[in-house]
């Protein structure tokens, strides 16, 4: 009888296993993962990957010291996510896709795209992602190739759709690659070029957003159309 009692109790435990307590939510409504990612971006921007520590990141985030390993698998995995978020701060894939798939003309889509880029450039000093990329330009990390595949290529493909509609260039042609570079690189340069230096050297690029937009639009449309004519 005693054996039957313990056997029955064991079977009940198997069919009704104890429930894990639910993880408490943060009072501010933000997920712990997002808070750690934000704190990490700021720490990496200040110190670089080599000097940053998981301990400091967790302290900044106000989380358990094991949060980096729990959510990202370690500092390396966290930095990979930080690079993706840094690129998203400049232009998210969702925003770009919304522009490309709109009912607007290709010329108007390019205008909206450039307006977004200029707005980002005007607020670049507030974005830790910009400092991350300045560090990467000075000393590229081994995480860049994966970041390019994960974050840059999907946006590049979307941008090519817009360029194709303006130029008529084949999507995989060398001319399309060059055209994409001639659109993307000036945008990146505008965002990454420190605002204080732009104000000193080229003040018209720092204060007159509307004038800059019209000039960039005319410059890029003229160039892209010329490339399309040359390829025909």
For every predicted segment, state its role.
Residues 1-31, 42, 230-232:
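N-terminal intrinsically disordered/low-complexity leader segments
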Residues 32-41, 57, 82-90, 159:
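Generic hydrophobic, amphipathic alpha-helix propensity
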Residues 35, 43-77, 81:
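Helix-turn-helix
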Residues 90-97, 101, 118-157, 204-210:
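Short secondary-structure transition hinges
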Residues 95-127, 173-183:
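Hydrophobic alpha-helical connector segments
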Residues 117, 130-137, 180-187, 216, ...:
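Short alpha-helical scaffolding segments that buttress acidic/His motifs in well-ordered protein cores
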Residues 145-153, 162-217, 227-232:
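Hydrophobic/aromatic-rich alpha-helical bundle segments in the mid-to-C-terminal region
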């Amino acid at each position: 009888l005693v054996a039957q009692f313990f056997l029955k109790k064991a079977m009940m435990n198997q069919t009704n296993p104890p429930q894990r307590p639910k993880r408490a939510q943060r009072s501010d409504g933000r997920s712990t993962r997002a808070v750690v990612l934000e704190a990490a971006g700021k720490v990496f921007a200040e110190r670089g990957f080599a000097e940053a520590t998981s301990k400091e990141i967790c302290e900044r985030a106000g989380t358990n010291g094991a949060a980096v390993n729990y959510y990202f698998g370690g500092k390396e995995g966290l930095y990979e996510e930080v690079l993706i978020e840094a690129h998203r701060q400049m232009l998210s894939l969702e925003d770009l896709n919304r522009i490309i798939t709109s009912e607007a003309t290709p010329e108007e889509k390019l205008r909206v795209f450039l307006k977004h880029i200029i707005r980002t450039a005007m607020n670049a000093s507030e974005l830790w992602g910009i400092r991350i990329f300045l560090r990467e330009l000075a000393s590229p990390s081994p995480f860049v190739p994966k970041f390019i595949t994960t974050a840059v290529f999907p946006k590049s493909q979307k941008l090519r759709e817009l360029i194709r509609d303006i130029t008529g260039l084949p999507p995989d042609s060398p001319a399309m690659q060059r055209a994409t570079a001639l659109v993307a690189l000036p945008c990146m340069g505008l965002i990454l070029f420190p605002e204080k230096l732009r104000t000193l050297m080229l003040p018209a690029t720092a204060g007159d957003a509307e004038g800059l937009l019209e000039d960039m639009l005319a410059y890029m449309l003229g160039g892209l159309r010329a490339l399309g004519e040359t390829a025909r």
